[in-house]
Amino acid sequence: AEADAINYRAPYQSDPSMRKAINSASMKYQDIHLSHMGMLVQQNFIDVDVAVIEAVRITEEGNVIPSSAVGNNVEYMDAADKIIIEVNEWQSLELEGMHDIWEMPKLPNRVPIPITKPGDRIGTPYIEVDPEKIVAIVKTDEADRNAPFKPADEISEKIAGNFLDFLEGEVAAGRLSYDGYIMQSGVGNVPNAVMAGLLDSKFNNIQAYTEVIQDGMVDLIDSGKMTVASATSFSLSPEYAHKMNEEASNYREHIILRPQQISNHP
């Protein structure tokens, strides 16, 4: 974005330089529901000439083991004329087994997604790829570019407190249980404050459907409060990204990374 090298961006943005370019109309942008982007690529509404995909390794069978995100990689590789795979040696090989790759059938032949619980696994731990499309495999050793989260301020803590009071009211009304609470979490400092509040709550065996795994969710898993979380990627501070790399084999039992069409499906 800073080099003025991006013509079009979709379906999401959070980078200040990119936001500035979009607002100045020097970069085209479409704000698309995150579960729709893969479908639009799948249905040939968006062409993909070259897909650049990050992986932790490529198996002997030619399958791709994704790294800390799945996103729309399945659809991008299926649609692309050419594929470049970046094997990032900074990412832990122990991430293998954390992914659950299930490809949504094309319209008009869609079927119900066979997931009823956050911990359900319905696919494979790898992405199948046409080897004829691969034009390059590049080795790198680069950390994810993630900024640390700001400490929870007074407003964030009040919002988190109000939310936890609401949950307590739902338990008192008989609509919710302290055991097995299934939640959906957003992105940012306020959701992280809610996670911190849940650490000191009466809730146990928490399960989550979310878009990204953040620091607060890792703390809940460490505490034993959260048993499983379903997402499409990590959005961790540098400290927690390092922690994930060091302990990926443990977190693999509690985290499932899925294609974005699945993780963000309404």
What do the PLM-derived regions correspond to, one by one?
Residues 1-266:
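Conserved alpha/beta enzyme-core scaffold
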